[in-house]
């Protein structure tokens, strides 16, 4: 499986044939393999990647990097893999591991929107807009009657909206710029400009 860590730069449009296609530009890598985990030793197979050099690290992390002979990195993320023996600590993974035209899954953290009402958070239609109505943007009934005399857990209500981990699947790689570590994918990816994104080979690619 191919994987890399990056940061979202922003969106633009490119021409593919006669079509204008919306794309997201991602600064992807270079990443360094910090640690590989195996079923025998750790209970599962995974590879730990580091991204962006760190100026300061605490002592436990400094010891972790020293153990594997890798420079301290700012971001550490794990990716599950089937065969961790393909990777070694210190190995560099660049954006050119991906190919133009292949499909990837991109994981990011959505924009945090703070405390939001039910209409914005869940898309509720709200109350009547006409004169005489006493609720316009409220969510309406939230329970039943004497029984069960409570609101069920999981009821869609006002609350904090956004800042959630979301994966968008099957985004096509439109272009790659290895010199500048840029990956261009078709469509949008979660998060604000400068947000961290995890890119891996599509789990169920389009045929």
UniProtKB/Swiss-Prot annotation:
Gene3D superfamilies: 3.30.160.810, Translation factors
The protein's role, per its UniProt record: One of the primary rRNA binding proteins, it binds directly near the 3'-end of the 23S rRNA, where it nucleates assembly of the 50S subunit.
UniProt organism field: Thermotoga maritima (strain ATCC 43589 / DSM 3109 / JCM 10099 / NBRC 100826 / MSB8)
MF terms in GO: rRNA binding; structural constituent of ribosome
Biological process, per Gene Ontology: translation
PANTHER family: 50S RIBOSOMAL PROTEIN L3 (PTHR11229), LARGE RIBOSOMAL SUBUNIT PROTEIN UL3C (PTHR11229:SF16)
UniProt keywords, alphabetically: Ribonucleoprotein, Ribosomal protein, RNA-binding, rRNA-binding
Protein name: Large ribosomal subunit protein uL3
Subunit structure: Part of the 50S ribosomal subunit. Forms a cluster with proteins L14 and L19.
UniProt-listed SUPFAM superfamilies: Translation proteins (SSF50447)
Pfam families listed in its UniProt record: Ribosomal_L3 (PF00297)
Record family assignment: Belongs to the universal ribosomal protein uL3 family.
One GO location term (cellular component): cytosolic large ribosomal subunit
């Amino acid at each position: 499986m191919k994987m890399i860590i990056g940061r979202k730069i922003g969106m633009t449009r490119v021409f593919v044939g006669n079509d204008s296609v919306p794309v997201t530009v991602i600064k992807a890598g270079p990443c360094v393999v910090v640690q590989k985990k195996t079923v025998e030793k750790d209970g599962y197979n995974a590879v730990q990647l580091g991204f962006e050099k760190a100026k300061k690290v605490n002592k436990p992390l400094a010891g972790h990097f020293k153990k594997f002979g890798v420079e301290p990195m700012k971001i550490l993320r794990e990716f599950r893999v089937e065969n961790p023996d393909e990777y070694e600590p210190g190995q560099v993974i660049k954006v050119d591991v991906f190919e133009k035209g292949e499909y990837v899954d991109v994981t990011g953290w959505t924009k945090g929107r703070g405390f939001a009402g039910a209409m914005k958070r869940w898309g509720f239609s709200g109350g009547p807009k006409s004169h005489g109505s006493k609720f316009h943007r409220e969510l309406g009934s939230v329970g039943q009657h004497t029984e069960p005399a409570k609101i069920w857990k999981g009821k869609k209500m006002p609350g904090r909206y956004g800042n959630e981990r979301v994966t968008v699947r099957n985004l096509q790689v439109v272009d790659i710029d290895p010199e500048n570590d840029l990956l261009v994918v078709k469509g949008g990816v979660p998060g604000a400009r400068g947000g961290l994104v995890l890119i891996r080979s599509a789990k169920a690619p389009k045929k």
